[in-house]
């Protein structure tokens, strides 16, 4: 199961959530991870002793209860209630940290952080952050581009010209997200987000030219940090026999499953004389039309069928 350390969570959100260490620095490597019986959204919540969260957030009501607990009003000790598995405690709303909670976290190597933000907002941000960071992921070989605001993954065997095609599309005003190793994350039940690893960001390898820095050559708008994957275009090598067998009037929708998410796919034969950049743009435009309920192939077949019926009726009504 994917997991991250408390240290990474702190580094990624320190300024956004105004986080500060209060105790438990030795537990900075505690892991926060997805459990089989708990979704990501259940990792964060207000202080709960019955169904403990991995990240326990102390708000106004929880702080008041802890103060009563420390004063002995409840008849319980910290150890009686805190004998639970948790990775991190955050005291929100700019509240002071009770000495009892600080001592308990220090003795048990539980990171204790403070934040000046209100606890509901703090939890919302952390849930979104964890949902993206701990999402199921996969790496696909190909080039990931933003074409007409649609996330397009171009795949195919090595040597078919994926990088050259990407370079042509970038020169036509489209944007590069990732080359070679595309990281895909399932951020929702039916949503895949494509990103590029920090090491490969901005770079595109083109045979004969080497490594190109796309941002430096084409400017800031030629690069996108991430994009939702909506369309896969698979390049295949085509010979005369393949082109003869190609069904040119198919209305069947092809999909490819990635991380149990079905993504629309299109197969483009690579042959001498074909302008692949124009074909990719046309495929994306056609996909956008289909999202609006318009299918050119189906429309042509319906028009063809109507014409056949009219011809048949005219033939029957023709006098002998």
From Swiss-Prot:
The active site is at residues 141, 162, 180, 248. Both phosphorylation and phosphorolysis are carried out by the same active site and suggest a common mechanism for both reactions. SUPFAM superfamilies: HprK N-terminal domain-like, PEP carboxykinase-like. Disulfide bonds: none annotated. InterPro entries: HPr(Ser)_kin/Pase, Hpr_kin/Pase_C, Hpr_kin/Pase_Hpr_N, P-loop_NTPase, Ser_kin/Pase_Hpr-like_N_sf. ATP binds at residues 156-163. Keywords: ATP-binding, Kinase, Magnesium, Metal-binding, Multifunctional enzyme, Nucleotide-binding, Serine/threonine-protein kinase, Transferase. The Walker A ATP-binding motif also binds Pi and PPi. GO terms for molecular function: ATP binding; magnesium ion binding; phosphorelay sensor kinase activity; protein serine/threonine kinase activity; protein serine/threonine/tyrosine kinase activity. Its cofactor is Mg(2+). It comes from the Bacteria. It comes from Neisseria meningitidis serogroup C (strain 053442). It catalyses: [HPr protein]-L-serine + ATP = [HPr protein]-O-phospho-L-serine + ADP + H(+); [HPr protein]-O-phospho-L-serine + phosphate + H(+) = [HPr protein]-L-serine + diphosphate. Residues 269-274 are annotated as: Important for the catalytic mechanism of dephosphorylation. Belongs to the HPrK/P family. This is HPr kinase/phosphorylase. Residues 204-213 are annotated as: Important for the catalytic mechanism of both phosphorylation and dephosphorylation. Homohexamer. Catalyzes the ATP- as well as the pyrophosphate-dependent phosphorylation of a specific serine residue in HPr, a phosphocarrier protein of the phosphoenolpyruvate-dependent sugar phosphotransferase system (PTS). HprK/P also catalyzes the pyrophosphate-producing, inorganic phosphate-dependent dephosphorylation (phosphorolysis) of seryl-phosphorylated HPr (P-Ser-HPr). Mg(2+) binds at residues 163, 205. GO terms for biological process: regulation of carbohydrate metabolic process. Its EC number is 2.7.11.-, 2.7.4.-.
